[in-house]
Amino acid sequence: MLNKFTDFIKIYCKSGDGGSGIIHFRKEKFINRGGPDGGDGGKGGNILIRGNNKLFTISHLKYKKHIIAENGKNGGRNRITGSNGKDSIIEVPIGTIVKDIYNNIIIEILNNNEEKILLFGGKGGKGNCHFKNSLCKTPFYSEKGESGKEFIFVLELKILADVGLIGLPNSGKSTLISMITSSKPKIDNYPFTTLNTNIGVLNYKNFKKIVIADIPGIIKGASKGKGLGFEFLKHIQRNKIIVFILSAEVIYYKKYYNIIINELNFFDKNILKKKRLLVISKSDLLDQELKYEIIKELPKFEKYIFISSFSKEGLYELIYYICNILS
């Protein structure tokens, strides 16, 4: 589990300066001053960004907001070119968007090991060996290296989770993700226990790992910024499957179901076009008659499963349903 989830950060980046070319003349026996042989400066290091499917947050960059690449080295005698500066690579989760401070999208990282150059390093300056000509046999000048580029980037993460768990506060989302993945979120009996998106990975039989995101509880008006607001709803946009969760403890199932549907519809209508499943949690509190009453209240077109993290009812059915769709 990621205790300190971060999905938005600003970082200052500077690529490396190019090394300078040098002024140097060949020295040989019996020759006081030979021809120019000053080498070129090395190229400054680039700033790159790389996708890493083992990362699920950009929290590791929270206290490293200055990324500076190495400068190129100056040239040497005998026309030796200075070594290039080392690149600085920013590792980010899949689904990271890179913007400028005006919110314009620059690039998006969508694949593991996908690598993009954010800033090129400065070019190395030329040594004096380049400036010899018929009019000037002994040039006493060389070029300085080009300065590196500076820029402030905004990194925003939209999680590329396979499954998004959505529900009202205290509906049992965190308990569910702790039961079917290795995630251990904070769980308590009060609303908004989940203050950040929790990420868990489900490993089941021969299926590839399945990433599940527990989105903080949605309340009426969430799409307009109420409660924890829409800042977390953006993570749902990239989920392949949406799992709606209603607690068996609520009384008006249809009402709370409609709150979730309406908020998602206001935020992004395309979310409701995704594969989805309705889960009634804490079903150990229900007898068969109450389950039947709930089913009558809910829309007939919804696929639903009753689950209990206490009795384990429905958990394997839920896992199988998710795996079957993703396969």
Curated annotation (Swiss-Prot):
What are its E.C. numbers? Answer: 3.6.5.-
Biological process terms in GO annotation: ribosome biogenesis
Its Gene Ontology cellular component terms are: cytoplasm
> Where does this protein hold GTP?
167-174, 192-196, 214-217, 281-284, 308-310
Q: Does the keyword Cytoplasm apply?
A: yes
Question: Which key words are in the record?
Answer: Cytoplasm, GTP-binding, Hydrolase, Magnesium, Metal-binding, Nucleotide-binding
Which metal ions or organic cofactors does this protein require, according to UniProt? Mg(2+)
Per UniProt, residues of the OBG-type G domain are 161-327
Query: Which InterPro entries does the protein's record reference?
Result: G_OBG, GTP-bd, GTP-bd_Obg/CgtA, GTP1-OBG_CS, GTP1_OBG_dom, GTP1_OBG_dom_sf, OBG_GTPase, P-loop_NTPase
Tell me if Metal-binding is a UniProt keyword of this record.
Answer: yes
Gene3D superfamilies noted in UniProt? GTP1/OBG domain, P-loop containing nucleotide triphosphate hydrolases
Primary location class: cytoplasm
Q: Where is the Obg domain?
A: 3-160
Q: Which residues bind Mg(2+)?
A: S174, T194
In terms of NCBIfam families, this protein maps to: Obg_CgtA (TIGR02729), PRK12299.1 (NF008956), small_GTP (TIGR00231)
| Protein name stated in the entry | GTPase Obg
Q: Which organism is it from?
A: Karelsulcia muelleri (strain GWSS) (Sulcia muelleri)
Gene coding for it: obg
